[in-house]
């Protein structure tokens, strides 16, 4: 088995809404990334969030909450994950490679934060990041972006930039918009990534977005966490719980200047049954449409050659026999028990 560490930190709070913490915790970048895993609208996050949004890292962070404003800024270092990442980090450290540093900040405006029935959220986030040592063994100045395309049961990462070498640093920037009224809520984010390279290589530019909405059918109330700047579990309209219908569209583009990691559109429809505060059932259907560059780093077929043979490289695809790429549906069911 492997070992990973999530929330483990010390915190000191001042009386004016300012507090600091140090340890291992999520970097504050984006609304979906700051949503607790038990409160996700769908079984998996949107592709752009899975690919770009940073999560748990060791660091130091300051937060200020005041009336309608939430501000967070932190400096972060290495990630504590499984055995593979641990081995990569150790081999790179022995070779004298730096573990990398990230400076991440987020600001959120919550103009009706005192109202429990309705609310509005407008946020921005930015992160300056140098390459980490967990991409591969003896692979300095290297980053990699990939995602499992809305299903973590599928181990193939069709969308994959492969290792990008000679990287100086990355810039992440994001915009967030959300709101709720009684049983209805909506949320959307746009994230862009500029990977700045050395040795005269062009900057690789990637981006993506998602929009999603949901409605509680039996009188429940959507809830929002002001301290997280994200939605939390709704309250229920019936003694037996509540049922929520949800829909999402997301797009990601990992095709840059020289790096072609693929692009994808995804549609997800979900039904959430909140049985108790601790028990939730989720049924999701997703339809994914990948382009011909989403070939899982050369492992997935993406079309046909002119002679009728299967093509694994995008440049081999004869578009007279089809545009190339993969389109498929995913049906998933989750039973979630929270403690």
Predicted segments, located by residue:
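Outer membrane beta-barrel
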Residues: 1-87, 94-132, 210-237, 244-246, ...
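Outer-membrane beta-barrel pore domains
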Residues: 136-339
């Amino acid at each position: 088995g492997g070992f990973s560490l999530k929330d483990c930190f010390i915190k000191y709070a001042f009386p004016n809404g300012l507090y600091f913490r140090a340890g291992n915790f999520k970097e504050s970048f984006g609304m979906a990334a700051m949503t607790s895993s038990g409160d996700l609208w769908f079984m998996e996050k949107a592709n752009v969030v899975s690919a770009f949004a940073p999560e748990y890292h060791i660091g130091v962070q300051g937060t200020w909450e005041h009336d309608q404003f939430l501000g967070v800024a932190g400096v972060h270092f290495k990630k504590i994950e499984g055995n593979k990442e641990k081995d990569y980090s150790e081999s790179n450290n022995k070779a004298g490679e730096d573990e990398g540093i990230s400076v991440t900040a987020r600001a959120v405006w919550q103009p009706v934060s005192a109202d429990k029935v309705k609310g509005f959220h407008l946020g921005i986030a930015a992160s300056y990041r140098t390459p980490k040592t967990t991409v591969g063994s003896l692979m300095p100045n290297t980053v990699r972006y990939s995602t499992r395309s809305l299903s973590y049961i599928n181990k193939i990462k069709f969308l994959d930039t492969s290792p990008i070498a000679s990287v100086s640093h990355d810039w992440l920037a994001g915009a967030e918009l959300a709101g709720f009224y009684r049983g209805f809520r909506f949320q959307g984010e746009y994230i862009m990534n500029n990977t700045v390279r050395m040795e005269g290589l062009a900057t690789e530019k990637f981006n993506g977005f998602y929009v999603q909405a949901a409605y509680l059918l039996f009188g429940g109330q959507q809830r929002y966490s002001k301290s997280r700047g994200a939605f939390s579990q709704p309250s229920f309209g019936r003694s037996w719980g509540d049922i929520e219908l949800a829909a999402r569209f997301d797009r990601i583009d990992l095709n840059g200047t020289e790096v072609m990691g693929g692009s994808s559109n995804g549609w997800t429809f979900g039904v959430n049954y909140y049985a108790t505060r601790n028990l939730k059932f989720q049924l999701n259907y997703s339809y994914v449409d990948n382009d011909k560059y989403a070939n899982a780093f050369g492992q997935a077929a993406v079309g046909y050659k002119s002679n009728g043979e299967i093509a694994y490289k995008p440049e081999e695809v004869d578009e007279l026999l089809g545009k190339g790429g993969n389109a498929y549906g995913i049906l998933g069911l989750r039973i979630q028990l929270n403690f």
